[in-house]
């Protein structure tokens, strides 16, 4: 999965543990959206996580 272009938040890895306590690999992906963003007055498509979008770190084009 993609990384956030602003905060570089990416996937986290760990184990999924079943009821019988067997472990298998699990990935938690960041909530990343493809967004058109203003960069130096031009519109550019970037992957941005929703926490950066909500906090106003980027300006949509």
Swiss-Prot record:
Keywords recorded for this protein, A-Z: Ribonucleoprotein, Ribosomal protein
GO cellular component: ribonucleoprotein complex; ribosome
Gene symbol of the encoding locus: rpmB
This protein's name: Large ribosomal subunit protein bL28
Gene3D superfamilies associated with the record: Ribosomal protein L28/L24
UniProt cross-references to Pfam families, sorted A to Z: Ribosomal_L28
PANTHER family in the cross-refs: 50S RIBOSOMAL PROTEIN L28, LARGE RIBOSOMAL SUBUNIT PROTEIN BL28A
Family: Belongs to the bacterial ribosomal protein bL28 family.
InterPro entries assigned: Bacterial_rp_bL28, Ribosomal_bL28, Ribosomal_bL28/bL31-like_sf, Ribosomal_bL28_bact-type, Ribosomal_bL28_sf
GO molecular-function terms, A-Z: structural constituent of ribosome
GO biological process: translation
């Amino acid at each position: 999965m993609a990384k956030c272009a602003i905060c570089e938040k990416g996937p986290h890895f760990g184990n999924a543990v079943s009821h019988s306590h067997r472990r298998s690999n699990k990935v938690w992906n960041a909530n990343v959206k493809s967004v058109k963003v203003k960069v130096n007055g031009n519109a550019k498509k970037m992957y941005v996580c929703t926490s950066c979008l909500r906090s106003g770190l980027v300006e949509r084009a």
